[in-house]
Amino acid sequence: MALERCRKVAGNLPMIAFGVRRAHPAIAPMLDRSSYIGGCNGVSSILGAEMLGRPAEGTMPHALILMVGEPVDAFRAFDEVMGPEVPRIVLADTYSDEKVEALAAADAIDLDGVRLDTPSSRRGSFPDIVREVRWELDLHGHRDVGIILSGGLDETTIPPLVQAGASGFGVGSSISSAPGIDFALDIVERDGTPVAKKGKYGGRKRSYRCPDCLGFEVSVSEKVPACRDCGREMMPAEVKLMEHGKRIVPTEAPEAIRKRVLEQLSRAVI
């Protein structure tokens, strides 16, 4: 849900999954796959992207600028070495004011975008920084240079950045380190008789989902209920995927799953 909330408020702007560096390497491909089918436009780990059949996406790192020494030298080195298929998106917040480094980059190479990853301790108002950089780029004839933002972004910080003129986002920690959902597996029926420990609801339950408004309902009745909001007959939310250790439903391509998720997200109220 953390990803879906970010996707919802980002609108149609591109959003790249940057969360694998906050996760154990063994689950990085799984995290990237979940991020992609959940609505991200791309993923940043090489293995995760390969398993999705897509190229990995990202920008130049701060480490390159720090090792080269001068931002402009690093921008030119990045441009010289990277293939033409790699977007020229460079970091513009390593040493100097963001607008100064952004203009220097735009003057040095054929730039696609700048990325601002300014630490929160140095930001002040991040939306105001974005507006200032956008103004200066436009003023100096670089209207086609985008502004990609990253660094602790979530569903509360993205909306004002959209209004400020952001071109896209790299979202990591709020996806990969999202709070867990508290749940437990409990015995609720014994030989057909409902039982439960205190604080739990006894009895075998069935869950249903409305195909229109996407509402959920849990019932002990076998009768399929009508949606309380729109009146349409609901559908079982539980689908058997495996039987006797074997998958019994066809495997869907990640693109097909992502398309369905985004279609449902467009109708969902979060």
Enumerate the predicted regions with their spans:
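Buried, small/hydrophobic-residue-enriched core segments of structured protein domains
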Residues: M1-R143, E155-P160
